Amino acid sequence: MRSLLLLTVLAALVVAILCYESHESMESYEINPFINRRNANTFMSPQQRWMAKAQERVREQRKPAYELNREACDDYKLCERYAMVYGYNAAYNRYFRQRRRAE
């Protein structure tokens, strides 16, 4: 009985130590995580924004075939479900390649 009481007190002490919330963990609540648009736009200069948009356009134009197939499959719910089980390549072959052969 005495060992059970000692074990309970020890467990309560461990829980209290692990659940203790220090002052450092409260710092994130003090600062507002949202900033206004004017301050948000100061992070990137217009030149950097233009470069980022240009790079994104290049990436969109030069996507590999498997990425295009995956995007087509993501837009069709049945294909997406089939892909979760058998993979995107098998799902694309089942739902889109057969249609092209039939036409």
UniProtKB/Swiss-Prot annotation:
One of its GO terms (cellular component) is extracellular region. The keyword Phosphoprotein applies. The modification 4-carboxyglutamate is found at E21, E56, E60, E67, E71. Residues 1-19 form the signal peptide. Disulfide bonds join C73-C79. Keywords: Chondrogenesis, Developmental protein, Differentiation, Disulfide bond, Gamma-carboxyglutamic acid, Osteogenesis, Phosphoprotein, Secreted, Signal. GO terms for molecular function: calcium ion binding. Requires vitamin K-dependent gamma-carboxylation for its function. One of its GO terms (biological process) is cartilage development. Belongs to the osteocalcin/matrix Gla protein family. This is Matrix Gla protein.
